[in-house]
Amino acid sequence: MGPVALPTWLQPRYRKNAYLFIYYLIQFCGHSWIFTNMTVRFFSFGKDSMVDTFYAIGLVMQLCQSISLLELLHIYVGIESNHLLPRILQLTERIIVLFMVITSQEEVQEKYVVCVLFIFRNLLDMVRYTYSMLSVIGISYAVLTWFSQTLWMPIYPLCVLAEAFTIYQSLPYFESFGTYSTKLPFDLSFYFPYVLKIYLMMLFVGMYFTYNHLYSERRDILRVFPNKKKM
């Protein structure tokens, strides 16, 4: 008897693609809900909706961002083809700003810049996860491919600027309340605002590195895509 072929649903490649599709779908639904909620609230309540943006969508934003840490595992085990370091930089800046800066300071949560930051982030993620979700099942559209590989070019630097402004606005509150700052037994202390100021400078260094990586990735994808269409 010859070797017995496994059913399609048991084949490793099928299971990997099915898992990635479900993951991308969950992320797409989460970010779409956030973006739609923010849009509807803005047109319904105007600027007043921007003040309590975090209270309305913060929990879902935190959930989506926490789940996105799985992407590091995807790259590490090889089920997602991408470079690990750029993704670490992207996720690190998001985690720090969302959880350590915005979530820890209620006064910062009411700033307009938080609403702007969330709009930029979710717009990028909606398009990115749509493209990834369709790509993993072999569906590709030239317009969507171009859009997903181009939208980040103006939006990503704006995201970083919004993150930097959020950190800058949070500094007086960290200085006043002493959040995360600790007095040590000897003549030294851990003063968190200093850490934020250093990180604020490093943020733009990371942006330069990530931007170059994304641009190289865009160039490679758009170069290969016309050849796929011809085949």
UniProtKB/Swiss-Prot annotation:
This chain's protein is named Very-long-chain (3R)-3-hydroxyacyl-CoA dehydratase 4
Superkingdom of the source species:
Eukaryota
Annotated Gene Ontology cellular components are: endoplasmic reticulum; endoplasmic reticulum membrane
Keywords carried by this UniProt record: Endoplasmic reticulum, Fatty acid biosynthesis, Fatty acid metabolism, Lipid biosynthesis, Lipid metabolism, Lyase, Membrane, Transmembrane, Transmembrane helix
Which reactions is this enzyme annotated as catalysing?
A: a very-long-chain (3R)-3-hydroxyacyl-CoA = a very-long-chain (2E)-enoyl-CoA + H2O; (3R)-hydroxyhexadecanoyl-CoA = (2E)-hexadecenoyl-CoA + H2O
Pathway(s) where this gene product acts: Lipid metabolism; fatty acid biosynthesis
Q: Which residues lie on this side of the membrane: Lumenal?
A: 41-56, 134-135, 179-189
**Protein localization:** Endoplasmic reticulum membrane
Gene source species? Bos taurus (Bovine)
In the record, the note on similarity to other proteins reads: Belongs to the very long-chain fatty acids dehydratase HACD family.
Gene that this sequence comes from: HACD4
Q: What is its main location?
A: endoplasmic reticulum
**PANTHER family given in the database record:** VERY-LONG-CHAIN (3R)-3-HYDROXYACYL-COA DEHYDRATASE, VERY-LONG-CHAIN (3R)-3-HYDROXYACYL-COA DEHYDRATASE 4
Q: Which Pfam families match?
A: PTPLA (PF04387)
Q: Which GO terms describe its molecular function?
A: 3-hydroxyacyl-CoA dehydratase activity; enzyme binding; very-long-chain (3R)-3-hydroxyacyl-CoA dehydratase activity
Q: What is its EC number?
A: 4.2.1.134
- Tell me, how does this one assemble? May interact with enzymes of the ELO family (including ELOVL1); with those enzymes that mediate condensation, the first of the four steps of the reaction cycle responsible for fatty acids elongation, may be part of a larger fatty acids elongase complex.
Which InterPro entries does the UniProt entry name for this protein?
Answer: Tyr_Pase-like_PTPLA
Q: What does this protein do?
A: Catalyzes the third of the four reactions of the long-chain fatty acids elongation cycle. This endoplasmic reticulum-bound enzymatic process, allows the addition of two carbons to the chain of long- and very long-chain fatty acids/VLCFAs per cycle. This enzyme catalyzes the dehydration of the 3-hydroxyacyl-CoA intermediate into trans-2,3-enoyl-CoA, within each cycle of fatty acid elongation. Thereby, it participates in the production of VLCFAs of different chain lengths that are involved in multiple biological processes as precursors of membrane lipids and lipid mediators.
- Where are the membrane-spanning stretches? 20-40, 57-77, 113-133, 136-156, 158-178, 190-210
Entry membrane topology? Multi-pass membrane protein
Stretches in topological domain Cytoplasmic: 1-19, 78-112, 157, 211-231
UniProt-annotated catalytic positions: 156, 163
**Which example biological process does GO assign this protein?**
fatty acid elongation
